[in-house]
């Protein structure tokens, strides 16, 4: 659990260290725009988005966050997990903010007292509220594998769901899911959301801040289910393309030669030459199968390597 003073408007903006870079720091000075790396995922707002009595503010956009104004009296804040009944955090402070240690889905209960009077009790409830689920850009298969779990989250919580992802992928899903709003990272309006969840691969999350379990143990696609707290059973997403016709009229073979990590590369020095030779030979054999008439629609095209 992290707690610190919220910055005044004149203070430097806090440095949010992005998914995959868990931090226990409270507030840090932001580097210059020239030096600051582009965040892997959109940042949450500095202050929580939801208003509450007595000048309190809270939200679930980076775990559970609550801001406590300096009202000349002590506050007591308690965070609980309603599913397990465990008290996660219970502290007294005069002002500042409290941020849960876990940033994945937890059914939080937030309680705040002032001078022994409880001024806020809020149970997480996304029904009818705006929720953002954000995915990294630059990957296709991962997001396709994760997206159906975002749909499950929407169905379970009956929220107004916005999904942030790479623009090329939006075209796959938008028509198939008209009840979900799709945006690019640049289009995210962070101050709209009651809750935000980041679905990605967190390689260095040793403290399990952004994921409840290591994706290498539960499976790359199922990690989304555990981050979002939904049933991990597989459910392929629907896709709807404006033009789903064949890009090439003849039968063809696709071979990809790129990968996101070295361990996925095929480093066999003769591998591609042998693969292409085999495919060319296979295409030639098909033309001589019984029933083949030599027409264009029966003849496989030459094998192309997709760069």
Model-derived segments and their meaning:
Residues 2-307:
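Catalytic machinery of carbohydrate-active enzymes
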């Amino acid at each position: 659990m992290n707690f610190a003073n919220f910055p005044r408007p004149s203070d430097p903006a806090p440095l949010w260290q992005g998914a995959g870079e868990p931090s226990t720091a409270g507030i840090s000075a932001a580097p210059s725009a020239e030096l600051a790396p582009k965040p892997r995922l959109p940042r949450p707002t500095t202050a929580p988005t939801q208003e509450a009595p007595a000048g309190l503010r809270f939200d679930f956009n980076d775990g559970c966050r609550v801001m406590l104004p300096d009202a000349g009296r002590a506050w007591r804040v308690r965070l609980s997990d309603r599913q397990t009944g465990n008290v996660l955090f219970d502290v007294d402070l005069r002002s500042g903010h409290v941020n849960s240690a876990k940033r994945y889905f937890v059914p939080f209960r937030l309680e705040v007292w002032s001078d022994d009077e409880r001024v806020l009790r809020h149970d997480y409830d996304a029904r009818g509220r705006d929720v953002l689920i954000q995915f990294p850009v630059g990957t296709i298969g991962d997001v396709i594998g994760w997206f159906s779990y975002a749909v499950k989250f929407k169905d379970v919580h009956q929220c107004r769901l916005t999904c942030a992802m790479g623009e090329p992928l939006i075209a796959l899903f938008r028509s198939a899911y008209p009840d979900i709003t799709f945006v690019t990272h640049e289009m995210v309006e962070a101050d709209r959301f009651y809750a935000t969840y980041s679905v990605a691969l967190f390689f260095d999350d040793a403290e399990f801040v952004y994921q409840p379990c290591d994706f290498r143990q539960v499976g790359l696609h199922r990690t989304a289910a555990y981050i979002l707290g939904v049933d991990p059973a597989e459910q392929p997403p629907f896709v709807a393309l404006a033009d789903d016709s064949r890009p090439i009229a003849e039968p063809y073979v696709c071979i990809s030669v790129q990968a996101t990590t070295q361990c996925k590369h095929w480093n066999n020095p003769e591998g591609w030459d042998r693969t292409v030779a085999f495919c060319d030979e296979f295409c030639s054999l098909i033309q001589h199968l019984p029933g083949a008439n030599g027409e264009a629609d029966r003849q496989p095209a030459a094998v192309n390597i997709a760069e």
